[in-house]
Amino acid sequence: MLEAYEKAEPGPELEVTDRVVVSFDDRKKSRHRVTTERGVELGWFLERGLVLVDGEILKCTDGTFVRVCAADESVSDVHSDNTLLLTRAAYHLGNRHVPLEVGAGYLRYQHDHVLDDMVRGLGLHVAAARAPFNPENGAYHGTGGHHHHHHDHE
């Protein structure tokens, strides 16, 4: 079984040899076991709270690199040219701590008929879909990235 304990920094020197396609719920697990597209078992053991983002690369202990891809899953899509309505919907969904993908003219969340009814009640159209789900990291959530500035504590 392949094991990964960290993400790789992207770069042209990386030779990605395999990939895993996983849901958002699986990408937010700090410890998880999956089968790669080549049929190899992979276990990742990452820092708690770290969420794998579509396209990120895992560095395996044997020196190989595996790309993480977001799987299609059951989502609700909300599209509108009305920025105020979309902003209101994002506010109400965020107030319920719903993981939310925010894009130009759309919102996407994991399908939930109660949330769909709430968003419709705000005057928006909701469409059920199967698509990759890539929600925003929370404002207070660490991304696991590098700390690029220095603190002088003298």
From Swiss-Prot:
Cysteines paired by S-S bonds: none
Residues covered by region (Disordered): 135-154
Gene Ontology MF annotations: nickel cation binding; unfolded protein binding
Annotated InterPro entries: UreE, UreE_C_dom, UreE_N, UreE_N_sf
GO cellular component terms, semicolon-separated: cytoplasm
Bias type Basic residues, positions: 144-154
Domain of life (superkingdom): Bacteria
Annotated GO biological process: protein folding; protein-containing complex assembly; urea metabolic process
Alphabetic keyword roster: Chaperone, Cytoplasm, Nickel
Keyword Protease attached: no
Gene3D superfamilies: Urease metallochaperone UreE, N-terminal domain (2.60.260.20), UreE, C-terminal domain (3.30.70.790)
Subcellular location(s) per record: Cytoplasm
Described purpose of this protein according to its UniProt entry: Involved in urease metallocenter assembly. Binds nickel. Probably functions as a nickel donor during metallocenter assembly.
Family under the similarity heading: Belongs to the UreE family.
NCBIfam families reported for this sequence: PRK13261.1-1 (NF009751)
Name of the protein in its database record: Urease accessory protein UreE
Organism the protein comes from: Teredinibacter turnerae (strain ATCC 39867 / T7901)
